[in-house]
Amino acid sequence: MHRYRSHTCAALRKSDVGSTVRLSGWVHRVRDHGGVLFIDLRDHYGMTQVVADPDSPAFKAAETVRGEWVIRVDGAVKARTDETVNRNMPTGEVELYAREIEVLSAAKELPLPVFGEPDYPEDVRLKYRFLDLRRETLHKNIVRRTEIIAAMRRRMSDIGFTEYTTPILTASSPEGARDFLVPSRIHPGNFYALPQAPQQYKQLLMVAGFDRYFQIAPCFRDEDPRADRLPGEFYQLDLEMSFVEQEDVWDAMEPMIRAIFADFAGGKPVTDKFPRIPYDAAIRKYGSDKPDLRNPIEMQEVTEHFAGSGFKVFANMIASNPKVEIWAIPAKTGGSRAFCDRMNAWAQSQGQPGLGYIFWRKEGEKLEGAGPLAKNIGEERTDAIRTQLGLGDGDACFFVAGEPAKFYKFAGEARTRAGEELNLVDRERYELCWIVDFPFYEWNEEEKRVDFAHNPFSMPQGGLTALSSDDLLSIKAFQYDMVCNGFEIASGSIRNQSPELMVKAFENVGLSQADVEERFGGLYRAFQYGAPPHGGMAFGIDRIVMLLVGAKNLREISLFPMNQQAQDLLMGAPSPAEPAQLRELAIRPVPQKKD
């Protein structure tokens, strides 16, 4: 028999009754029932109940073991009685009667429990992550993550993609976030950067004559953490294709990701045909370029109903500024003053002056609008708004006014708030969509200049003619995102493979041809030697896993994450370097000034 085990703790079944077996694992818990000890023995695969009665030669050792000790147990497999069968365990029809117990490793008193879902401080959980990972939910999440990545690899291979790996030490490149820099010992004063994404390398692969590349790529960005973004590193399913238009990328990736969701959704419905929503339409309907389509609320413009109306706040805004619009947020079943007042109070808590509203109720046989706005604009305008929005008895509507560019984010948050408060969001489904036609440029208010809105390597719609126009902010890019339940899970574009277009695109944001050659020299040179039309995208693996397992944040699906301050409490990183190491790298720390 093997030194440690003949079976795993998930393997034994009724067919094994009468067998002598050996198991090894962690003591999950010990229970004393009338002098008989019951030990739940756990390993990576599952759990088996071990029994030690006072007549057993293993009983003395069984009395000493404690939770999370690692032990080896030899014994006989016996069937449980009908009344003691545990239908919730694969091994629940049998138990192991111990004949010998060997303690392989004792455990100190635990700083946190490893069963159940303890509400322990995150820093304690991360410092003792090796214990935290023993919890069933977290353990299952990590296993499921591995299964999802394996399924991605398999499905990408099935549709003709080949996995290639690209360098981890590379040059610094402005991708929209800070780089992690790595000093060069051989070239003092110079630095490598960890890649924010394999963007340039995968495009160079297409220029080199490869096609249908993919990679499970580690990416590194020195960003502030949040619930849907880990500090430091993350992983993406990266891909690129040659001789394609954006529809070709969509047609290849939509069935693949739908199949991944269907495989791991646990029976929840998944969108069959992903709608393609232009960016501008998404902003106006949902107040976001990553809308949660499980929420049925769609905003509409109702400016005309307030122009020249008795509600002077809106009417005067419209009259004095042609950019002003009034957006309506319909809220079916929200037609109570209490709910409307809660929404108004919430808006004020967000720094807004309030949230105007109308709600409708029947007065006898007549449907009437109620609330201050209804009284000010009159019955005819109130009814016109209700008709436009398709509302009825017991429904409400909220209004946001101003220049859309300044208020659309708040309007989107109000839409989300109303949908959640009214339980309109179906949380038992996955709603996916494409967001397309992103703006190529945007206005940088801080620096008072035009800047790239998203990926600077995207192909602008309209080509050189558009880039030479006076209205740069109207240019759209062949850029697209995939969104699921309010989270961006992928982003991509058709690339700009023309050196002339590349230079012009960067000139419009204040960078010269020399700047382009210095910052993107490899890509710029490559495009001068026969570059095919190409495009691709990248899926955020961490976010996809988080959605599929129902985790609240990314730390619940990552093995050894950092905390919110970008610290690895388990390994003690970041940490000071030894003086000798710094001298070797020609680096001298500069003392930080105290505030």
Curated annotation (Swiss-Prot):
ATP binds at R221, D222, E223, E488, G540, I541, D542, R543. One of its GO terms (cellular component) is cytoplasm. HAMAP family: Asp_tRNA_synth_type1. One of its GO terms (biological process) is aspartyl-tRNA aminoacylation. It is found in: Cytoplasm. The gene is aspS. This is Aspartate--tRNA(Asp/Asn) ligase. Keywords: Aminoacyl-tRNA synthetase, ATP-binding, Cytoplasm, Ligase, Nucleotide-binding, Protein biosynthesis. Gene3D superfamilies: Bira Bifunctional Protein, Domain 2, GAD-like domain, Nucleic acid-binding proteins.
